[in-house]
Each structure stands twice: as C-alpha cells, then as structure tokens.
Amino acid sequence: MRLRDCHNFSDFRRMAQRRLPGPIFDYIDGAADDEVTYRRNTESFETCDLVPNVLRGVSEIDMSVTVMGQKLAMPFYCSPTALQRLFHHQGERAVAKAAAKYGTMFGVSSLGTVSLEEARGISVSPQVYQFYFHRDRGLNRAMMQRAKQVGVEVMMLTVDSITGGNRERDKRTGFAIPFKLNLAGMAQFALKPAWAINYFTHEGFKLPQLDEHVDMGGGTMSISRYFTEMLDPSMTWDDVAEMVRQWSGPFCLKGIMSVEDAKRAVEIGCSGIVLSNHGGRQLDGSRAAFDQLAEIVDAVGDRIDVIMDGGVQRGTHVLKALSLGAKAVGIGRYYLFPLAAAGQPGVERALEQMRVEIERGMKLMGCSSIGQLSRENLRFR
C-alpha cells in the first residue's frame, strides 16, 4: 500500500497498521476498557444531519478562525500527543512542519519527544504546550516558565488524566516505555523489520520536557508509573486558578465535559476549554464530546472559546461541530496514523484532505465563511 492510495482516515490507519509492530499500533489505536467511548466518539456524528442551502455564491471560501487569540487558516489543529518518535523517527518535527505549511496550530506534549525549543524553531504557527499537573509544585512552575521563555502561545492543562486509563490492549502486548514486551509483543516487532530499521538507525528515544526532572531511562520510571506516581490526583480548582494567574496568557483546560466545570473554567479566567474524553482512553462509558457540545456552548459559549476533539475523521465532522458552536476542532489519531505510515508527507496529505473536505462541504452547504455556519444547518435524528 502506497501513500497515494490513502484517501481517508481508514486508509491511513490501514497503512500504519501494515508498517507498525502490533504493540505500537495498538497504543495509538486502542482505548480504555471495552472501548465503548472510543467508538461512540465517531458514531456520535452520525446522529446529526447537515441541511445545505443553495444559490449562495460560494466561489470564494474563507475557512479561517480565531481561537484563544490565535489566527488559524483552518478550523482544526493538531492536538498534542505523546511519544510520537515511536511512530516515525520524524515525530513532532513532521507535525510542526505540516502545521506551519497549512497555517494551523499544533501542540507539544509533556510526553513529547522533541523539546519545546526545537518545535518553536521549526514552526511559526501558534504552539500549544499540553501540560500535566505534578505533585511537585516547583516542577510545575519550572515547566511553565520554560514554555513562556520559548514563546508558547497557549498553555493547555489536561485535567482528565490524574491517573492512567485501563488500556487492555497494552496489557496484552506488554507495551510500556521503556520497552518491556511479553513474548507475543516481541514477536510482533520481529514481523515488522522496516519499523525497527527506521527506529534504530535514527536518534534515540527521549522525552526532553521531562529529562531534567524525571529519570525515564534505565527502567526506573515507566509511562504508567509516571501517571500514577508523578501526577497529582489532589489537584483542585484553586490550583488551576493559580496556574492561570502565573501564566498570564491564553490558558486552556483539556478534558472538560460538564456544564458545571465549564462555568468554573470561565470563573477562573481560562481562555478556552476542550471538550474531550482523551480519545476514549481514560473513562470508558463517558459521553462523546460532540454529544455534549451544544449543552456547554449554550452555557458558556459567549464567554469562553469552546473547542472539541474526539473521533473526528471527516471534514463534515468538523462542519457539524462548528455549526453547533465549537470555535475549532482538535485532531489526534487523524494525523498520527499518517505520521506512522509515511512521516511528514503522510501528515501533509492528511491535512490537505481535511482542508479539501471542509472547503467542499462549505460550498455544498452554501457557506463562504465559518461564521455562516449555525444550528440552522443541522437536524438531529
């Protein structure tokens, strides 16, 4: 299968599956428990129909948006995701370059495999730093200060991951960082020598945001232990309010799903919230972000930028979310599978396909700008 044969999310996923060892593919593709929420994230869009208008003069399309003060050429962005170096040696570098080419925002994770400084040097596009709240308050302050010095535009605190989700696919293969595979997992690596050549003939795996603070090497600290031992489950709204004051710039909470929490985010001065269930990877059975979007937009949409992610695989999914009131949409697996399949060319092809789908969809709906999308364009079954 070649990159030019990939025309949609499923094609990229299939190509990535052919290239990646099973444990790494399952790390991207898998979710928590029975993966009900994971499936529901995409299925939720199917209960909503688009109602187009015609004869509206749509020869010129403007799909730009402004979210949390950042001007994006397209209404979707590359959400911060962890461990990208495992999927392809270009990792976040490929994503940053692709985001710059298409004029959209991208994010670097606390578990990212390139440094904030390097990512900032690659792309002038708006950059998000996805941050986890640690037990060590000094560590939190130091990491925020580092992001500020680099010129990160948006601080994004993930609030739905105070402990790791129950990802049973990883348990079956023994997937962990550092690698501690069982026999079945090791056999899968042996079947994919091309991945091994790519991985071992390029620079080694590292986590630059944590290198100075946490020893992740030598088997001393696994990713799962990082979540259970380093992150602070006692985090409260008072802690977050203090972070918002310290950052004194656009601050976003990722993982908000209730109206009550959305209102609290407004009260403490957040610029945005991301409705997210972490791609179904944390609390299985939780509500899909798209299903919860209208309720939260109605409650706080005039006071804070409401964003959503989860299950987005088509341009029409983005248009439905925007019509409900989202200011932008985050994508994760949508670009990770192309990254794993083909590096930067794969990510660029995926972003271009999404751009074209949104442009085509807007023309067919009779909308020449994002601001013309509204709930009048939607009907729920």
Predicted regions located by residue number:
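An N-cap/entry alpha-helix motif that binds or orients negatively charged groups
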Residues: 1-69, 178-235, 371-373, 379
